[in-house]
Amino acid sequence: GFAQYTECGGIVLIREGEEHLYEDNLSSMSAVGAEYELLNASEIEKLYPGITLTSFGPPKTLADEKFGQTSGGKITSAILVPAAGYVSDPQLASHNLQMAAKNHGADFMFNAPVSTVITDKNVSGGVVLKNGDVISSGSTINASGPHSSIINQMAGIADSLKITTRAVRHEVVYLPADARHFQMGGRFLVDTDAGFYQRPDGADLLIGTTDPECDGMNVVNSDHYNASVTEQWTLQAYRAAQRSPA
C-alpha cells in the first residue's frame, strides 16, 4: 500500500506582540504560493471550542513553581494553513520511495555497514563496505538520518559544514482524542507559548514538543538510547492541557 498524506490543516498560535517573528515565514509561504489565513482571537475560539487564549509563556518545566500560571499576555492571532498535514507512517513512506527508486534502476544493499568514505581533495568517490567491497561513484549522498554526523566525520567534512546535525531524543504523547478537537475537523496546532504541538492521528491525539529552551537537548547515541517513557511524556501532556483545560 501507499503512505497517505492527511491534509488536516494547521494553525500556529501567536502571542500578542510577537507577530513580527513570523514575517519571514509568511513571506516565504507567499513566495511559493502556499495559502494561509490570518485569524483573530474569536476566529480561533470558533475553531477550537473550549480553548483558552491566556499566555503561559515562556514555557516552563513541571519543576517550576510557576508552571500553569498565566504570564499576563494573550494569544491574539494565529496563522491557518489549510494544506498542512502529516504522514503517519514514515516507514511505509520510506518503503514507497524505495520501490519507486528500484523502478528507476536503483539497487539497495541492506546490512552492509560502511567502513570508509572515499575522498580525494574533498571530493567523494564512493564508499568501502565493512566486508571490503568498494562502491565507486561520482557523488555520495548522506541520507543517514541520526547517523549523518558520523558519516560526515568519516568523510572528513564535519568541520567545514555550516550546518551540523545531532541525534536528539524526543518523546511524543498519544492520548484518546477529545471529540471537541475533531468536531470542526482535527488540525495541526503549534503553540510555542506553552511549548507543544498537537495533531490528530486516527482516533488519537499526538502531542510533541516545540523544543523550548527550558527543556534543553537530550543528545543521544543514535544506536543506544532510552526507548522507555520518561517524565517528558507527562510534561507534554500537561502543557497541552493548559491550552484546553475543560
Predicted regions and their residues:
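Active-site lid/adjacent beta-loop-alpha segment flanking the redox-cofactor pocket in flavoenzymes
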Residues: 161-164, 178-246
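A general structural signal for well-ordered alpha-helical segments in protein cores
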Residues: 19-23, 41, 94, 148, ...
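Short beta-strand and adjoining strand-loop segment in the mid-core
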Residues: 11-15, 79-85, 227-229
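Helical element adjacent to the flavin cofactor pocket in flavoenzyme catalytic cores
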Residues: 65-139, 143, 147
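Conserved hydrophobic/aromatic beta-strand scaffold that supports enzyme active sites
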Residues: 12, 126, 172-174, 197
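Flavin (FAD/FMN) cofactor-binding core of flavoprotein oxidoreductases
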Residues: 42-53, 60-61, 167-168, 230-246
